[in-house]
Amino acid sequence: MIPKLPLSAFIICLNEEAYLGKCIESLERCAEIVIVDSGSTDGTAALVQSYIDAGWPIRFMYEPWRGYAGQKQFALEQCSQPWCFNIDADERLDKALRELLPELLAASDEIVGWRVARRPYLIGYGYTPENVRERRNLRLIRRGKGRYDLSQKVHEGIVPEGNVGNARTGSLLHFRPLVMDEQILKENKYSTLKADQQVESGKRPRFYKLIFTPPIYFLRLYFRNGLWRCGLSGFIEAMTGAVYAFLTAAKIYQRHALKARPNVDDALSH
């Protein structure tokens, strides 16, 4: 029996039967696994129950959808261990990160959390190599030392109450190979959430952002982050990021334009 660590992993999910099993199996050292489902209609519940029946320390519960940040905050509040780790259903800890966990949890009191590297799976290539840099995300937090910003509709993250460090090795492996048809639907959804969030916070459209942000986004991902190392698959990934940046900026502009100008029917009535 592998000794358990004082760690709660928390996962939000909806119809994740195809991915959740691998995620759970990478959390074998966690003393607790909290899974919050928002109404799955596939075999997610049966899959989770099979792990519970096999003795996994899983707490499975239903909670109506609160938005990404709200749902993760609810899941975080259910955790009972001294440390809490957020992981998505389509992610799993690689071997190096699993082996590093005891060291991270033994950090001095001044460290309240850890940022972790993430390596996505690219169709036609595989997982990006470790020298391809993706922004590290704060995933590991001491219980009671961080909360989600509920104003964030997408790309939500934990706001820590103290110092955080970067895990020196190991990665979260992100496996959800979406073909371009599916990827565009995802980018459209996320850019809508981001644009709505920006407009609600008072963000105004900027001409230069609409023109320059998409190519700058591509160049940053492809050259600075190193996606050029992944061949054509890396090019597609970087270009998809640029599309997301363009859609977000364009939607911010159009939302403001519709508020500032009368619609066609109003103009014709005068």
Swiss-Prot record:
Pathway named in the protein's UniProt entry: Bacterial outer membrane biogenesis; LPS core biosynthesis
InterPro entries, per the entry: Glyco_trans_2-like, Nucleotide-diphossugar_trans
GO biological process: one example: lipopolysaccharide core region biosynthetic process
Disulfide bonds: none
CDD domains hit by this protein: Beta4Glucosyltransferase
Class of this enzyme: transferase
UniProt xrefs under Gene3D superfamilies: Spore Coat Polysaccharide Biosynthesis Protein SpsA, Chain A (3.90.550.10)
Keyword Transit peptide assigned: no
MF (Gene Ontology): glycosyltransferase activity
Keywords: Glycosyltransferase, Lipopolysaccharide biosynthesis, Transferase
Enzyme Commission number(s) of this protein: 2.4.-.-
Family, per entry: Belongs to the glycosyltransferase 2 family. WaaE/KdtX subfamily.
PANTHER family linked: GLYCOSYLTRANSFERASE (PTHR43630:SF2), POLY-BETA-1,6-N-ACETYL-D-GLUCOSAMINE SYNTHASE (PTHR43630)
Protein name: Lipopolysaccharide core biosynthesis glycosyltransferase LpsC
Organism: Rhizobium meliloti (strain 1021)
Gene name for this UniProt entry: lpsC
